Regions:
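Residue-level signal for inorganic ion chemistry
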Residues: 21, 37, 90, 97, ...
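Short, flexible loop/turn motifs enriched in small residues
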Residues: 31-35
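Short, glycine-anchored, charge-dense loop/turn motifs used at functional sites
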Residues: 43-49
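A short, polar/charged loop-to-alpha-helix boundary motif
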Residues: 56-68
């Protein structure tokens, strides 16, 4: 497998892509799902190849997107792609991205920040295992960009009243 370097992303590109992922999350919420959104971005850093909102507790946006990508694109191409997601990938999603051979992830808010919003909500028992730790246990140099302060408030706004009454102090 190839581990060719990625085309750099500008901060403006990162912010634009995260805002688009947040629109996917907004649509997921409008459908009654949890407000998470993910994009698969082509090696050019601009072209969005796929969008995915959260499906359910087991089919997170990032995992569904990574599995679909692995079925439709060759691994060396996926290594050059970027998975953009509103919240830091959980251990399941990071693992799925790793096995799909998607070489970079960009996320808006940390899993720890998400946990402060979800608290002990039964529908989202959020873990506290940073994706950098998951990737560090593997053999592939997955690039991680995040959190991104410029979009944190926008992403948090979709979650704030979703999990009300279940916050950690």
């Amino acid at each position: 497998m190839s581990f060719a370097p990625h085309t750099p992303l500008s901060q403006d590109q990162i912010i634009t892509l995260l805002r688009r992922a947040n629109e996917v999350a907004r649509r997921a919420r409008a459908l009654g799902r949890h407000p998470f959104g993910a994009l698969l971005v082509a090696p050019d850093g601009h072209t969005v190849l796929a969008e995915q909102g959260n499906v359910d507790t087991v089919n997170h946006a990032e995992s569904v997107l990574a599995r679909t990508a692995a079925l439709n694109y060759p691994p060396d191409y996926l290594w050059q792609c970027t998975l953009v997601t509103t919240a830091e990938p959980c251990a399941m999603c990071a693992g799925t991205q790793y096995w799909a051979h998607i070489g970079r992830v960009v996320y808006g808010i940390t899993e720890e920040r998400l946990l402060s919003l979800t608290g002990d909500h039964a529908e989202n028992p959020t873990m506290n295992l940073p994706c950098r730790e998951v990737f560090a246990r593997g053999q592939k140099p997955v690039e991680v960009i995040g959190p991104v302060a410029e979009v944190e408030d926008e992403i948090v706004a979709l979650h704030r009243d979703m999990w009300s009454g279940h916050h950690h102090a």
